[in-house]
C-alpha cells in the first residue's frame, strides 16, 4: 500500500522544491489544525458545503487523530496511511484504469487530500456567487487555510518522491499515540539491498525501517527493524547509558 505502481516517475528538481519543504506541516499537527480551523469554523454556516463532505472529513480526521494510550494495530495504521492523502493521485489513476469504479470512488471520498480539494472547490464556487458586500476576511482566511493544508500534503508527497529519486529512505507520517506533545511519528523505510531479493516479487522483498520516540522515562529511543516475509529483526538505540545498561 505504501508505494505507487512501478512506473518511471518524472524527475523532481530538488533545488526548486527544497526551499518549500520546511513550510510543510507534520501530519499530526495538520489534523489538529483542520479540526479546529476548518470543522470548527463559523464560516461553514454561510457556505453551502454538502453535509456528507463535512461528515466524511470529520470521520477521516477522527481516524488520523492520535488516541493517547491506545496503540493502533497494523490494520488501523494501514487505514491511517491510506486516508492521509499521500496516495491520492495513485487512487485517481486506479479509478480511471479499473472498470469497476465504485470501490475506488468510495476510497477517494475518504481520502484527506481529496476531501480538502473538494472543499476548496465548493468554497471557491460559493465565494464567486456571494455579493461583494457579503465577502469578509473570515471567508478569505478560511479559503486560504484549506489551500495551505492541501499545499502541505503535496509537499509531503514531493518529499517522498525526492527521497525515492535521491535513494533516501521513504518517510511515512503516522499519528503518535505515545506523546501528547509530538503528534506525529516519522517512519523511515528503505528497501534492503543487502538481503536476498527477488526483483519481480514484491512479497519477497526485505525492508529496513526506523522511527524515533522521545519518552519521558527513557529519553530518546530509536527503533530499527528489518522486515521480510518470514523474518523480523528489531533493535533499539538509546541515548542514556543507564537505560542501555538496563
Regions found by a protein language model. Name each.
Residues 1-246:
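Extended non-catalytic alpha-helical interaction modules
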Amino acid at each position: 500500500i505504501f508505494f505507487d505502481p512501478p512506473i518511471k516517475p518524472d524527475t523532481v528538481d530538488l533545488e526548486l522544491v527544497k526551499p518549500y519543504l520546511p513550510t510543510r506541516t507534520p501530519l499530526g499537527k495538520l489534523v489538529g489544525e483542520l479540526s479546529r480551523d476548518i470543522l470548527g469554523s463559523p464560516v461553514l454556516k454561510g457556505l453551502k458545503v454538502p453535509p456528507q463532505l463535512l461528515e466524511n472529513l470529520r470521520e477521516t480526521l477522527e481516524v488520523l487523530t492520535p488516541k493517547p494510550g491506545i496503540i493502533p494495530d497494523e490494520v488501523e495504521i494501514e487505514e491511517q496511511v491510506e486516508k492521509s492523502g499521500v496516495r491520492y493521485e495513485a487512487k485517481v489513476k486506479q479509478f480511471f484504469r479499473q472498470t469497476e469504479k465504485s470501490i475506488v470512488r468510495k476510497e477517494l471520498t475518504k481520502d484527506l487530500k481529496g476531501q480538502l480539494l473538494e472543499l476548496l472547490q465548493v468554497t471557491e464556487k460559493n465565494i464567486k456567487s456571494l455579493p461583494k458586500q457579503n465577502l469578509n476576511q473570515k471567508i478569505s482566511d478560511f479559503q486560504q487555510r484549506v489551500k495551505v493544508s492541501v499545499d502541505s500534503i503535496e509537499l509531503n508527497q514531493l518529499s517522498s518522491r525526492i527521497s525515492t529519486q535521491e535513494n533516501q529512505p521513504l518517510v511515512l507520517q503516522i499519528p503518535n499515540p505515545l506523546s501528547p506533545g509530538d503528534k506525529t511519528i516519522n517512519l523511515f523505510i528503505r528497501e534492503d539491498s543487502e538481503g536476498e531479493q527477488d526483483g519481480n516479487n514484491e512479497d519477497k522483498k526485505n525492508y529496513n525501517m526506523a522511527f524515533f520516540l522521545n519518552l519521558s522515562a527513557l529519553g530518546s529511543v530509536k527503533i530499527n527493524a528489518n522486515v521480510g516475509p518470514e523474518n523480523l529483526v528489531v533493535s533499539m538505540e538509546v541515548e542514556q547509558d543507564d537505560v542501555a545498561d538496563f
